[in-house]
Design a protein with these regions (language model features):
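Structural detector of well-ordered beta-strand residues that form the stable sheet scaffold
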Residues: 12, 63, 143, 168, ...
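Beta-strand->loop->alpha-helix junctions that form or flank phosphate-binding loops
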Residues: 39, 65-70, 88-99, 171-172, ...
Length: 287
């Protein structure tokens, strides 16, 4: 009996790597207030790293392009990525800047607030991307975020577009983007806040989500997915519009759920599924 060939997705993730320092508390403090927290732990983090790890755990062949400082946080992160079977050949080291860190507070409902000190992430350059051209050329999908310089995102997008590669952009943190970048992006994955930044429309319900998706699509992107947390995701795939509800689970901590969604979506699309099928898969993975 002939065993069918299953394509192993090749994904290049270009983005940030941080060390997350997480404190759990019953509630989040208000400005000027000091409260006592509970447990404290450190994890590998940064949107790029989280998405790379998610894609690797779902079976993809992942290359991660990023930059760390020459310090303990950076070296520890590098070892973690290697243990996840991520190709770290193009994680560069900046001898002058520290590795990125994120300070995260999580309340009893699983909601969080985050402050990021980007460090070496902000020195990831177009010249660094050039060194990984061959990997980009070989990839099925290029997955990016906005925790690295916008100039680098624009350069990598143009290069991937030139090579005919699928580009998925998670436009976080929220920022205004030029239409040339958006036209070369195959799928964009904003949350409510990022969708409002891109569309000028506040997303409060299904109707406003539909209007925001239309406004973003008018900038030249056929495929738009607005992630709506526990409600699910509103999807535009070419001329189809659909609300896909999230899987119902007990929420412990929402930190990183959006990054798992992005990583899972990139894997599913690279395996040949439609966008709607991929969003359903990503919803389940991020639950």
């Amino acid at each position: 009996m002939e065993i069918p060939y299953i394509h192993k997705p090749k994904i290049v993730v270009i983005g940030s790597c941080n060390t997350d320092m997480v404190v759990k508390a019953n509630r989040l403090p208000v400005p000027g207030e000091t409260i006592l927290g509970g447990s404290f732990y450190m994890n590998p983090g940064g949107k790029g790293a989280n998405q790379a790890i998610a894609a690797a755990r779902l079976g993809a062949d992942v290359t991660f392009i990023s930059k760390i400082g020459y310090d303990l946080f950076g070296l520890q992160a590098l070892e973690i990525y290697k243990s996840e079977r991520i190709n770290t050949e193009f994680i560069f080291t900046d001898s002058k800047k520290p590795s990125g860190v994120a300070l995260i507070s999580v309340d009893s409902f699983g909601e969080n607030c985050i402050i990021v000190a980007s460090g070496a992430n902000q020195s990831l350059s177009p010249e660094d991307i050039d060194k990984a051209k061959d990997k980009i050329r070989e990839a099925d999908t290029i997955l990016m975020q906005l925790e690295i310089p916008l100039e680098t995102v624009e350069y990598a997008t143009a290069l991937a577009y030139e090579y005919g590669k699928r580009v998925i952009l998670n436009p976080a943190p929220a920022s205004s983007l030029n239409n040339e970048l958006l036209k070369k992006t195959n799928v964009i994955l904003p949350n409510r806040i990022e969708a409002e930044m891109l569309s000028g429309i506040k997303v409060t319900n299904l109707k406003s989500a539909h209007r925001a998706v239309q406004a973003i699509s008018c900038k030249g992107i056929e495929n738009v997915v607005i992630t709506l947390g526990k409600e699910g995701a509103f999807v535009k795939e070419k001329d189809k519009y659909i609300m896909i509800p999230a899987k119902e689970v007990d929420t412990i901590d929402t930190t990183g759920a959006g990054d798992v969604f992005s990583g899972a979506l990139s894997v599913s699309l690279s395996e040949g599924r439609s966008l709607i099928e991929a969003v359903e898969f990503a919803n389940a993975a991020a639950a």
